[in-house]
Every structure is written in structure tokens, then in C-alpha cells.
């Protein structure tokens, strides 16, 4: 039982770490000498433009889309942290034989938020780049970066983690 418990804890910590990295790091769209994410666009290592600074509609078209991605990724990270804390509390407070349902529900909500954020970015990325060509002029020839991929991996991890919590019962 201790091995299963250790595995679940490590799995949850890894999925939360993936959420933090994918939300914070600047590599959702990368290419030769540039990178862009949900927070900023960098044409080289020293020339970065914060998207939040360009929030007026005439400067950055589609800002609400980026805000939606930012909000869902932040919310998924927060929910994953909360579900881990609730899991630790339930570990000591639940009666023997009960399931970790609250932890599972919150972890699955985190999974849903990651899916929404990554899906919105996937769907709207090309439109954002074309509508804001003055900012993304170098970024047309690029590919999805490791932060974007980590967001999808975190989606899978949080989904599996949520299912594990749903199935798991407290034992001695």
C-alpha cells in the first residue's frame, strides 16, 4: 500500500510541476531565434514584448483569447495544488474504505482547464499570428514548443491522476 501511495503522490507532484512549467515558461510557439507563449513574444533572448502591455484592441487583436488561455492554465495549476492538499487532508481524515472523491473531482476540473486552455491556443494560434502580424512577423515559420507539449502531457497526467483518485480507497 505504501508503494501505491508513494506512486500516486509522485505522479500528482509531477503533473503539477508540468502544469507550472507549461504555464510559466516561454515556449508555446518556437522557431529559429524566437519564442512566444501565453505571456510574451521574444524575437531574440533580449527583445521580449509582454502581451499584457499590448492589451488595447488596436495594438493586440485577440487579447481576450490569450487571457482565456492564461486564465485556464493558471486555474488548472491552482486546482491541481488544491487537490493535492485536499488529498493529504483526506489521507488522515477519511474513514477506512472511503474514496477520495473530492480530490478526484478537483483534479478532473484541473484536467478540464488544461484541456480548454491548450485547445483554445491550438485553435486560435494561427488567427492570432495573422491578426497581429506586426508582433508575430518572425513567428510564422515555427512549431509548437515544449511548453505546449508539456501542457498536453499535463492534461493526460491530471486525467489519469483524477481517475486514480476516483478508484482509490483508503486502507490501513
From Swiss-Prot:
Expressed in glomeruli. GO terms for biological process: actin filament organization; actin-mediated cell contraction; apoptotic process; bleb assembly; blood vessel endothelial cell migration; cell adhesion; cell-matrix adhesion; early endosome to late endosome transport. InterPro entries: EMP-2, PMP-22/EMP/MP20-like, PMP22/EMP/MP20/Claudin, PMP22_EMP_MP20. GO terms for cellular component: apical part of cell; apical plasma membrane; cell surface; cytoplasm; cytoplasmic vesicle; Golgi apparatus; Golgi membrane; membrane raft. It is a multi-pass membrane protein. Pfam families: PMP22_Claudin. Keywords: Cell membrane, Cytoplasm, Golgi apparatus, Membrane, Nucleus, Transmembrane, Transmembrane helix. It is found in: Golgi apparatus membrane; Cell membrane; Apical cell membrane; Membrane raft. One of its GO terms (molecular function) is integrin binding. Its main location: Golgi. The keyword Nucleus applies. The chain crosses the membrane at residues 1-21, 72-92, 100-120, 148-168. The keyword Cell membrane applies. Belongs to the PMP-22/EMP/MP20 family. Interacts with PTK2; regulates PTK2 activation and localization. Interacts with ITGB3; regulates the levels of the heterodimer ITGA5-ITGB3 integrin surface expression. Interacts with P2RX7 (via C-terminus). Interacts with ITGB1; the interaction may be direct or indirect and ITGB1 has a heterodimer form. Functions as a key regulator of cell membrane composition by regulating protein surface expression. Also, plays a role in regulation of processes including cell migration, cell proliferation, cell contraction and cell adhesion. Regulates transepithelial migration of neutrophils into the alveolar lumen, potentially via mediation of cell surface expression of adhesion markers and lipid raft formation. Negatively regulates caveolae formation by reducing CAV1 expression and CAV1 amount by increasing lysosomal degradation. This is Epithelial membrane protein 2. It comes from Rattus norvegicus (Rat). The gene is Emp2.
Amino acid at each position: 500500500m505504501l508503494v501505491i501511495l508513494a506512486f500516486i503522490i509522485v505522479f500528482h507532484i509531477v503533473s503539477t510541476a508540468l502544469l507550472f512549467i507549461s504555464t510559466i515558461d516561454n515556449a508555446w510557439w518556437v522557431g529559429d531565434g524566437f519564442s512566444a507563449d501565453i505571456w510574451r513574444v521574444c524575437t531574440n533572448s533580449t527583445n521580449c514584448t509582454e502581451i499584457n502591455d499590448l492589451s488595447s484592441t488596436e495594438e493586440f487583436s485577440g487579447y481576450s483569447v490569450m487571457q482565456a488561455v492564461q486564465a485556464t492554465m493558471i486555474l488548472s495549476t491552482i486546482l491541481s495544488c488544491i487537490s493535492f492538499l485536499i488529498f493529504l487532508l483526506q489521507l488522515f481524515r477519511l474513514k477506512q474504505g472511503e474514496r477520495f472523491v473530492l480530490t478526484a473531482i478537483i483534479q478532473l476540473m484541473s484536467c478540464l482547464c488544461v484541456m480548454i486552455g491548450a485547445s483554445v491556443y491550438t485553435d486560435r494560434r494561427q488567427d492570432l499570428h495573422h491578426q497581429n502580424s506586426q508582433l508575430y512577423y518572425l513567428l510564422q515559420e515555427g512549431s509548437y514548443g515544449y511548453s505546449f507539449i508539456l501542457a498536453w502531457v499535463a492534461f493526460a497526467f491530471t486525467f489519469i491522476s483524477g481517475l486514480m483518485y476516483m478508484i482509490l480507497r483508503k486502507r490501513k
